[in-house]
Structures are given as C-alpha cells and as structure tokens.
Amino acid sequence: MAVGTVKWFNAEKGYGFIAPEDNSADVFVHFSAIQGNGFKELQENDRVEFETQDGPKGLQAANVTKL
C-alpha cells in the first residue's frame, strides 16, 4: 500500500486528490473509497494509506485509510 497526504477534498462533491509520498502523480480519490463508518470525508493534509487502481480517467485511490 502507498502512503500520501490529502492535497484537497471537496466533501460536497465527494472527491479530491492525494499526493503520494513517493512524489508520483497525484491520485484521484472518491468518497466511496474511504474506509470506515459514518460520513466519509478527508481533510487537507490528512495522512492516508491507500491502494491504486485504474479508473475511468486514470489512476484512482482504493481502500483509503486515515493514519
């Protein structure tokens, strides 16, 4: 799994981007990929662990967990 920092996340629209620690390209994240109960959102600068998978417009995050 990769580790990164949330660049931004729009809770109203339910998506944002993660900057991976390995300095690779930013990864799209959709609220449905966030693990946990309750309202699923991320905050700017949250550290997260995630997997990547191919999405309709390129790489996207999957199984996102806050650290």
From Swiss-Prot:
Domain of life: Bacteria
UniProt keywords, alphabetically: Activator, Cytoplasm, DNA-binding, Transcription, Transcription regulation
Gene Ontology molecular functions: DNA binding
Membrane-crossing segments per the record: none
Domain CSD: 4-64
Segment forming the signal sequence: none
InterPro entries attached to this UniProt entry: Cold_shock_CspA (IPR012156), Cold_shock_domain (IPR050181), CSD (IPR011129), CSD_CS (IPR019844), CSP_DNA-bd (IPR002059), NA-bd_OB-fold (IPR012340)
Subcellular location: Cytoplasm
Cross-referenced PANTHER family: COLD SHOCK DOMAIN CONTAINING PROTEINS (PTHR11544)
Xref: Pfam families: CSD (PF00313)
PROSITE patterns: CSD_1, CSD_2
Name of the featured protein: Major cold shock protein
Species whose genome carries this gene: Micrococcus luteus (strain ATCC 4698 / DSM 20030 / JCM 1464 / CCM 169 / CCUG 5858 / IAM 1056 / NBRC 3333 / NCIMB 9278 / NCTC 2665 / VKM Ac-2230)
GO cellular component: cytoplasm
Chief place of localization: cytoplasm
Lineage: Bacteria, Bacillati, Actinomycetota, Actinomycetes, Micrococcales
